[in-house]
């Protein structure tokens, strides 16, 4: 069983709603109508140590990461962050003052970056570190995962660095390289390891694009998975190649990786994948903040890459 099947079971089981719920399961955030002009958006994301937290991350970086992962969903809705709740389960290893202070220092610094204060949560004891965050935002125009036929499909900035960083991490973890070699490679590819350690949610971009785009989601599970939420599309590998940074190309050459597959499968990038019929206006609105790249089009029917059936990608939890 995979997470998509689990979600389908949950959706079929949960039947009750009310007139305040505009959108529940099936988008980056739930959308709740406050009044005629504003919507509350809410999202939750969880990090489990063994599944999500590389051992090379510091407690400070873990704190920043859980906040970024949640706030990135707020960004994809074109909303302004309001507040953040975080619940933690600590094992004996983490239940000490040093770890807790560092973790919450990361949360505090990133909350200032996103203007999203941490306002509460819960604490518990467990066998391993687990963090569960809930972020709230507000908007007058929530952006869904969708597109209109003919829309350009676009991505902010670049993709691939997180995949490369995790490749290095697993090489170290599986004893394929020494720690000394790992440190050398981190120094050789500083931007690659930095994207893993300190990812940034595109809050400003989401707000600036709000009235100019038709659909959006954040790239948390990889472009290859997120693109399928837009249902019918054609994307092009030569365009995807243009948003792959030089250090990722160099890394792929050094370690015999396909850069297109790396870009499609690189998760937790937290860039924005969006659809628009106003590419030039979006580009102008983001000057000084982010570059954007066209990678394809919304079409009438089907999912294709370079004219062939799309083979998918990205990360899906499996049991």
Curated annotation (Swiss-Prot):
SUPFAM superfamilies, A to Z: PurM C-terminal domain-like, PurM N-terminal domain-like
One annotated GO biological process: thiamine diphosphate biosynthetic process
Binding annotation for ATP: 104, 121-122, 145, 220
Keyword Metal-binding: yes
EC code(s) of this entry: 2.7.4.16
Pathway linked to the protein: Cofactor biosynthesis; thiamine diphosphate biosynthesis; thiamine diphosphate from thiamine phosphate: step 1/1
InterPro entries to which the protein is assigned, alphabetical: PurM-like_C_sf, PurM-like_N, PurM-like_N_sf, ThiL-like
Residues the record lists as binding Mg(2+) 1: 44-45, 122
Binding site for Mg(2+) 4: 28, 43, 73
Catalyses which reaction(s): thiamine phosphate + ATP = thiamine diphosphate + ADP
UniProt binding sites for Mg(2+) 5: 221
List of residues binding Mg(2+) 3: 28, 73, 218
MF terms in GO: ATP binding; magnesium ion binding; thiamine-phosphate kinase activity
Pfam families: AIRS
Residues reported to bind Mg(2+) 2: 45, 73
EC category name: transferase
Keywords: ATP-binding, Kinase, Magnesium, Metal-binding, Nucleotide-binding, Thiamine biosynthesis, Transferase
Binding site for substrate: 52, 268, 315
CDD domains, sorted: ThiL (cd02194)
Signal peptide feature range: none
UniProt cross-references to PANTHER family, sorted A to Z: THIAMINE-MONOPHOSPHATE KINASE
Extra remark: Reaction mechanism of ThiL seems to utilize a direct, inline transfer of the gamma-phosphate of ATP to TMP rather than a phosphorylated enzyme intermediate.
Family per similarity comment: Belongs to the thiamine-monophosphate kinase family.
Function: Catalyzes the ATP-dependent phosphorylation of thiamine-monophosphate (TMP) to form thiamine-pyrophosphate (TPP), the active form of vitamin B1.
Record protein name field: Thiamine-monophosphate kinase
